[in-house]
Amino acid sequence: MSDPQEEPRGVHNPRVVDLITDDPATGEVVLVMLEARPWESEPLQLRQLEAKFNAYLEYVLGGHMGKQYPDYADRPVRIQLDCAENPRSEDRAFFTAMSNFAAAEQIRLVVQVMQTPD
């Protein structure tokens, strides 16, 4: 994956991990995918999300995260999609498939709606 300071962040760019942090409450390493666009704003949006998700899986399962961040190497991983709004109900099967695939690799997928400042 590319240096995040050289590449734009967001679901539209699968070449960069948008954010890596840790969650002390769960012990998980959290890889965040950022989606600031509303759903259906881009015809290829779900394909872009799929490409980003697959890139994150490769980053973790291919050992790249552990090489780049040795302290995270043996920690549980959560991939978190921070999005502008809840996914559409008609896309539920897509998100369920992603979650099931991640779970089969011992990775948790979480979808979280970003809070906007009032």
At which residue positions do the language-model features occur?
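Acidic/negatively charged segments and metal-coordination signatures
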Residues: A36-P38, Q45, V111
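Short glycine-rich, basic-tinged beta-strand/loop micro-motifs
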Residues: V29-R37, Y72-E85
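Acidic, aromatic-enriched beta-alpha/helix-loop junctions
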Residues: P43-K67
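Helix-rich interaction surfaces within compact, conserved domain-sized segments
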Residues: R78-D118
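N-terminal intrinsically disordered, cationic/polar leader segments
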Residues: D3-T21, T26, T96-N100, V111-V113
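Ordered, soluble secondary-structure elements with a strong preference for glycine-centered loop motifs
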Residues: E40-R47, S89-R92
